[in-house]
């Protein structure tokens, strides 16, 4: 309670000294935050909804999440500690009057409040268009202008709905969106949160057949994160202009709010200061920045204040103010990634590709060649080698190294550049091959190789259910790896490898979830990291 009181005093002082007033703009750019899940995990790391709206650093807040649809019955919401324990009689639906009061407070300040549906945990989806239409009526009655005895936020009315559909099937969502359009006013916002691989495994067809106001593309936990050479904002911009039913749809650059907010893809402010102005100047569909989530960003130094200034000033970021708002520092500890001194850095200048026997300056520097091979700087000369059959050279998601992987598409993946060099280059020029999806029964997955060095690697397995049946508490992942690669650990449970057969016993953070994000590590016995085969993956 003391921490919250101090926080409120700090905000009041900040607003008094600056007079900052955030407000949503239909033309953008805007800054949006997911709020409710307290993913930072501390007892005081998430402030009240109204606190963030009063900060002057937020244009829209996404209430996260309505995670159980229960079509035909009463849905369920989960806002972590912001609303817990008080249910409507004979239901599992929370009553959250304090959140309802804060919704009105936010709206009075011009901040949009949007209800996000789905998320990683929970059970959701439709079996028919009729169910989608029926659920739109439920949203109208419980959160819109309709009436019900079980309105979680009282008479507060939300400003929009966000589809953060991490798993399941696409059935019914277009009908749901179209039904919402008929019930709510024309300024009601409807958005979606696809992952960056295009098209999205779940929402791809929905985005092509229904009208959305914005799309929060998740540029993290995948190969297409912003710091890698496969950053594909240009692909989403092209979709917005050529395929989207709403040609004025805004593409939001959605990122983690701190290094611990996602398995991979965090972008430091020094790099954002290059990327954000480039996006704003190059793509007319750019709508601003969305962040997962508020608890992470507000416990990451001056991230939130610097980001708001960056987005709304066209790129210049002033020094941190002494009145910058912060929540109490998270009490729990997290592991910090370490790198070895033998990392195969990839710092070739944009536009240049290694050629065999040409000179190079950095011993053990690795890079991709123009024809999909990989080069190693060995005693001042490039030594070029072919990737194993069926694979090509692909840069890692952190932009500092390379690996050999199975890919779709064609073209050059060189040069592998540093994150800052990638950001400075033209985003529209990256048309090379991208990692091929991993498919298993009822699961779509991606393996994002985060980093490699001469002896080790780190990667993220991002798995999504493609049916309405969620992952359970314990999930066994099995696949085959090349003979030079040894998987040794994961952040979700023990790893066992016999020969080239790998088994991960993942302990899900949730009893039921539509997605799994598993961080893995291992060793490289010789050569470079080679990705596992895309076939014969099993999730049990």
Swiss-Prot record:
Reactions mediated catalytically = Random endo-hydrolysis of N-acetyl-beta-D-glucosaminide (1->4)-beta-linkages in chitin and chitodextrins
After translation, the protein is modified as follows:
O-glycosylated.
**Record-annotated membrane-spanning stretches:** none
> Which Gene Ontology BP annotations are present?
chitin catabolic process; polysaccharide catabolic process
Region Disordered, annotated ranges: 314-348
- Chief localisation class: secreted
Which residues are the propeptide, according to the record? Answer: 418-540
Residues of the active site: 166
UniProt biased composition (Low complexity): 322-348
Where in or outside the cell it occurs: the entry states: Secreted
Q: What is its EC number?
A: 3.2.1.14
Q: Which SUPFAM superfamilies match?
A: (Trans)glycosidases (SSF51445)
Q: Which UniProt keywords apply?
A: Carbohydrate metabolism, Chitin degradation, Chitin-binding, Glycoprotein, Glycosidase, Hydrolase, Polysaccharide degradation, Secreted, Signal, Zymogen
Q: Which residues form the signal peptide?
A: 1-22
Gene Ontology CC annotation, any one: extracellular region
Extract the GO molecular function terms from the UniProt entry. chitin binding; endochitinase activity
Q: Where is this region: Chitin-binding, high affinity?
A: 353-404
Residues in GH18 domain copies: 29-314
Specify the superkingdom. Eukaryota
Task: Please describe what this protein does.
Answer: Probably involved in the apical growth and branching of fungal hyphae.
* Complex and partners: Monomer.
Record-stated family: Belongs to the glycosyl hydrolase 18 family. Chitinase class III subfamily.
What name has this protein been given in UniProt?
Answer: Chitinase 1
Q: Which gene encodes it?
A: CHI1
